[in-house]
A protein has these predicted regions:
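Acidic, small-residue rich beta-repeat scaffolds with periodic aromatic anchors
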Residues: 121-162, 204-207, 213
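An exposed acidic His-Trp-rich patch
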Residues: 73-137
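A short acidic/small-residue loop/turn micro-motif
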Residues: 78, 159-160, 192, 220-228
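Acidic, low-complexity proline/glycine/alanine-rich linker and hinge segments
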Residues: 152-195, 233-245
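Short, positively biased Gly/Pro-containing turn/loop motifs at secondary-structure boundaries
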Residues: 226-270
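Start-of-domain marker
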Residues: 8-79, 84-85
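Sec-dependent N-terminal signal peptides
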Residues: 1-6
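Short tight loops/turns at secondary-structure junctions
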Residues: 196-224, 238
Length: 270
């Protein structure tokens, strides 16, 4: 399981990591794993400048891996400067940097021995995005398994998307017409829906294969209160449709365009 480095309500810029001389994005804040380090560092940041929503912590850390060890090389504080109307920053002075991280120093370097778990580094285009923390995926990702600052495992992935239908397309014009083609419900089977203008359902869980077949689909009818038969019919109708959009992410085919969507379905327009 990837480290839950911290939680954020909006998209966050990643840290920077250099591996074999290549600059990559580290999708997380490993400094936060040591609360003492984190709060000591925060106390050193300028207090008179507002942070930006894309970097609530107010800093970006720069890391590198050499001889299978994870090093923290520097920290850059960043804030919004209203005078120039831009994000500005500068590196924390070396004397301050080494004072904060002194307990992890080895010679003239900081070994990130407080870090254990899996961290994710990435490059390339974003293929999946949520406006929350580091919830996004790139074309090229590497999962590093870290034990007390030492790299003990590595898995590299080439992620991609296969086109097909996904519920985000319902935000386009003609959404209900499109939905009714995919989901032709037999409303006559449900007399309790005679006077209901619309129902709302949620796909709680979904699973797809590499060809866009929907293999598994768990549906909940949110409104109105209906029996399990309607939810089952919706699930079966969705599974009969093909192809669905497929995300291949870090070794798994995922139904990100289907799962956890809440969908309104118009029964009567009057």
């Amino acid at each position: 399981m990837l480290l839950a480095l911290t939680a954020y309500a909006t998209w966050q810029e990643g840290d920077v990591i250099y591996i074999n001389g290549e600059r990559l994005e580290l999708l997380g804040r490993p400094i936060c794993l040591d609360s003492t380090l984190y709060h000591t560092l925060k106390d050193e940041l300028p207090s008179n400048q507002p942070t930006v929503t894309s970097n609530w912590d107010g800093f970006t850390a720069y890391w590198s891996i050499n001889n299978d060890k994870l090093y923290l090389d520097s920290v850059r504080c960043e804030a919004y400067d209203p005078n120039v109307k831009a994000v500005v920053g500068k590196s924390i002075p070396s004397i301050t940097f080494y004072r904060i991280f002194n307990s992890y120093s080895a010679g003239n370097r900081i070994v990130a021995s407080w870090v254990s778990g899996k961290i994710r580094v990435a490059k390339g285009k974003v293929i999946y995005y949520q406006h929350s923390g580091f919830e996004r995926n790139y074309e090229e990702e590497t999962i590093l398994d870290i034990d007390k600052g030492k790299v003990i495992g590595k898995k590299e992935y080439h992620n991609f998307v296969k086109d097909g239908f996904a519920f985000d397309k319902l935000q386009e014009n003609g959404a209900q017409e499109m939905l009714h083609k995919i989901l032709p419900l037999h409303i006559e089977r449900y007399p309790e829906l005679v006077n209901v203008k619309r129902l709302i359902f949620r796909v709680k869980r979904a699973r797809v294969d590499e060809k866009g077949n929907l293999l598994e689909c768990n549906v909940q009818v949110v409104r109105p209160d209906a029996g399990p038969q309607l939810a089952t019919e919706i699930a079966e109708a969705l599974k009969n449709y093909h192809p669905w959009k497929v995300y291949y992410i870090n070794g798994e085919y995922r139904a990100l365009g289907i799962e956890n969507w809440t969908i309104p379905y118009i029964l009567h327009d009057k």
